[in-house]
Every structure is written in structure tokens, then in C-alpha cells.
């Protein structure tokens, strides 16, 4: 063979390898185990591997924790107790409607401890659309491929006459029935952690493709010999097979919050598909969603981090609706227990996700955002209030009235197609009342706030300063929406004035926000490093920046841009000192700030996540460009310890996605995104309207992190923000990056992002 021919073959092989590498798709970069190495005292994400489709009604997960444990999967665990259908948004909120399936061989073991099998991450494969693990105790493999409301299981058994599958419907009221002639198990679970009506049930159906050689039901881990149907506090089923070596047994699983019949209907999502076809359909669904944003980088870890964060950004809020036999969208109402028409979504806390998760959906996936807004309207119609934390119904968690932000942002961006007047009515209701049973829904302390302009420190309402600051922003959101709707001026003026209530807590002596008593005096003594008390999971240094809608007003209160920048610098330069006396010990959020090595900047919790972007409002955008990259480099990794605190239903992930693209919605409702700097050399967003937005930064790297200049659609662009409706037109942003800050760019007030005070002048 001559040298020329050898060279041709070598080139062909190289091209083939290059082509194979190029065929790697977005979902291939996702690590569902990112953030799973967590515990109650330290959160590296507090996530679990959600085996699901985007926004799916049901997720599946390997269960390592005990029944009812919020930390249901932890990376440090070495035993699996079952494979659980889960709807858990957070370990702190816990789960509802859960049940589990556990295969085994040799001896039938029902108890959750005795049935657990050793496993290794080396024999575990986790992707969003497919999960596989070898259970060493039983010499068998379990595989799962999900749909939105179903899952396809494939069990590969050894040769044995003692192959079993145990179904656990969990405690606190459950039902199960084995139907041997149909190779089927049906049942329901009522297990929940609150936020459900009295008639709440999750009905399930499991169909196997192999006849049973053994079938029993059980109660409280004891087999029942006399019948195959049982309802009690804690029941389940056990079925068995004889299998050859390598034989695969399949199970199709569906569930419904509506009825057993609807659970059977939901099985149609799998229909006649094989396991492999279901798996491939899931892969395609994920690539369709993740592929809306294409980033390019030679560092695979950055690609993995980006797409793992994007995956987390499209899980919640989850669908809580189904499709009936007539093809109509219907839902079980977690608010009144009725079956209603239309969409419903749940499992999100607006205190976290109003900040950038919902704006992200509104920009990249507006048709899904439209459905979510209809779901919010249905929540108001069915319960009298918008949710603040829903799982599946109203939950007593966190502070604020941030449904106003979620509703207003979608409306201002023309995402909402639901009855906007009715939604505005709901905002007014929530701003001037409190839910009779769930005081975190609506506004706790609204009477004081409306009268005094703040929630006082001395009236036994906890976290009062945090409430005041968030209520003021929420009032601005109501004002914005009302203005666009053409509401009466006298009505708008109420919320316009209230939006300035943040000023009532500003202490000119310390230049920080501070709790205030009902007589108008500031709380004393005052320690700005004290967590909790007047604030929520943070201190005054963190919450002072919660003036999303009027940063210029805050700049003015502090004495001008120079002092404002100095105060921002202080957060990042101060040591991570803290006062934990309010909690009586170090909470995990404090520990996560302490170990991050970024001063008093607590990125692991939401109140401060927008802070670095505020340099853009004071003429020093290069500091934002520096610190945003530091945050991404230091605090995010595509590993089990990859987050710097609770991931929180997409918020902390969507922060990374936005920031990596180079912009962030500091003030939802303003239709603006504040500039950072792109993280990748190239990113392409395919918008839902078919337009493409290309973000190019050819010289971008860790040294060249500063924007020297920006060319936007062929023109020099100096502003520190981008407009939502301009982005929807598509186009090209070309960044010239440098290793030195350009201190002459973005320094004029005309370049600064929206602030109410400046806009009102």
C-alpha cells in the first residue's frame, strides 16, 4: 500500500472521528447527578437525578433514603431501596403522591431496609431520558425510560425461579390490587407533605409483559395470604417470575391525580412503543428543548455545566394536568379537590424563581410560559389567591408576594394569553389580604405595610424587612401591569407610591437596610451581619440590594455612584463573618457562604444573586464582568458537589444559563436584561418565532473577560442592557473581549439599565 493511500485512509479516519464527536447532542452533556452530594447541614445543590421529560408531571428517581426522607437520593449513599415516582421540588418541602418499585432475586424482602441493594456509581448511568443501575445484591439491572406521565421499566434478571418485584404504595393511606390474569397491579397512594385537599390520591397502574408465578399483597411489610386487594395505612404488592439468564421483564407504569381510569388513559403515552423507542423519544424530546440554545467551547466541563444547568431550568414548575378521553386538557385541583378544565402547574417557590427562572421561560420557551400563566389564573380562580409556594397546593414557606412579578413579567412581554384583567384582579387581592390558612400566601402584615409603609420589626411578624422590600418591588410590578392595562390613575398611584416603600428601611448612618419599629425608630442593636431576624435567610448586606426596580433610587440614598460601588465592593471584600443567633446555630446557607471564599457574597441563596450586575447601574460594568466570571468559575461544576447551595427549582441554574449567555433579568417586569459578558466563544439561541440570536466572542477566555466593545447588528453598542423585544427580532451580538477593562464604555447614565426614579424624571 503506497504512502498516498495510507494518508488518505488516515484523513478519512480522522474526519470520521471528528464527525462522531460533532454529533454529540445537548442532552449528552447533562449530568443529572450534579448537586446530589448534599446533606441537611451542607447543600451542594440538594438535587436528585430527575429521570423525566421537560416539565413532566412525574419524575422517577433511585431511592437511597428512607421512606419520607427529603434527601431521597444522596450521592454518598451506597444502597438503593427502590425506584420512586416523585414530585418533590425540594427536600425542605418534601414529596407527595409517591410510590416505589423494587426488583429483586433469591429471597422476597418487603421491608425497605432489608430489600435495599448495594450499588456503585461505576455501574450507574444517569441521563434525563434514561437511567440504568446494577443491583449487586440481586445480580440484576434496572432501566427506566420516562414519558410525561409514564415510565417504562426494563429488568434484566439472572436465571432464577425467584425473581420478584415489590410495589410500595407508602404509608398514611394506600390501596393496592393485583390482577394476575392481566399481569397488572393497580392502586393509589395518598402520601403527601401538605398542600392537598382531603380527597387527594395518586392512582397508579403497572402492566407487566410476563405472567406472574407469585402474587401477594402486603400490609405493614407483612404478606396477606387470603386476598389480592387491600386498603390500609401502608400497603403494597409483590409479584414473582421464573427467568432465564439475561431475560428481560418489562413494566409500563402510569399514574393520574384524577382517577384510575385516567391512569389507564395515560398509559397511551407509551402505547405500543418498545423500551428502546420510548427511550429514543425521550432523548429526542430533551434535545428539542435543550437544543434551543447551542453553545460552543473547547472545555467540555463548561459544556457539561451549561447543559446540566439548562436541564434543571426546564424541570419546574411541573405539569399538573392530564388529557382526558376526549383529548381535552383537564386537571385535578390541588386547591379545591375538583376536576377542572385547563392547565395547572406546580412545585415552584416564587421567592426563588421569580428572579430569573420565569423570565428565562418567557424568553426561550414562551408557549410554555403561556400555559403556565393560564395555570396561575386557574389557581386564583380555584383558591382565591395566586400561589407563592405551590406543592401541589399552597404551602407555608418563605416570604413576599412575588406572584406579582411572575404575572407582570409575562404580561409585559406579551406571553400571557389568559384573562389579564382577571389576573390583575388577583394581584390586587393578594396585595391587600392574606390567605386565611396559609399566611405566606398573599401578604402577611399588609395592614401595617399599607398604613405605615413597612412591616414593623416589633409586631411579631418575622423577617419583616425582607417582606417590606419584596412588597415594594411587587407593588411596582402591579403598577406596571395596571399601567399597561389602562387602569385608573388614582388606582395606579397607590402602587406607584408604595413601590418607594423600600426607602423607609434605609438607614443613612450605615447605608444599609434595617428593621424599623412601629413608632418609626430603627431596631437596636443592629448587626448588619445577623442572619434572619428582620431578613430571610440572609443579612442586611445581602438584602440591601433588593430594590430591583429602582437601583438609581438606592444609588441616590447611598450618596451617589462612588459610594454605591464601594458598598458593592465591600460585600465581596468583607470576610465571611456572620451572626447566627436568630437561628441558634449555623444554618446550611451560612455555611455555604462561609466556605465559598467570596467574602460575604452568598450566591448559594437567592436574595443576592443579582447583586453583581448592579455595577452596571453605577458606571463600572467591568467589575460585573470580572465577578460574574469568578462566580461561574468558582461556584459551579458539573459534579455531584457542583452547586454552592440549594439549586431551588431552576433558579440557581437559570442564573448560570443567563450569565453564561452574557445578560440577566435583574428586574423582571422591566423588559430589560442587564449585561454581564459572554462565557463562551459562541452561543446561538433559536427563538420560538424562528429567529436566531447569535452571541459571538472569538477572543473570549478567562483572561479576556472584559468587553472592549460590542457590535449589535452592525452598530457599536455601549448600553449596559438589552431590550427583550429587540432580542426577539434575532440578530448578532459580536463582543470584542480584552484582558483589560474598558473604563470608557457603559459609563454614561444613558447607558444604564431601567430604574424607576430615573424613568419618572
Mark where each language-model region is.
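Accessory carbohydrate-recognition regions in carbohydrate-active enzymes
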Residues: 23-358, 362-405, 411-469, 477, ...
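Bacterial Sec-dependent N-terminal signal peptides
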Residues: 1-23
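Extracellular attachment/recognition segments
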Residues: 706
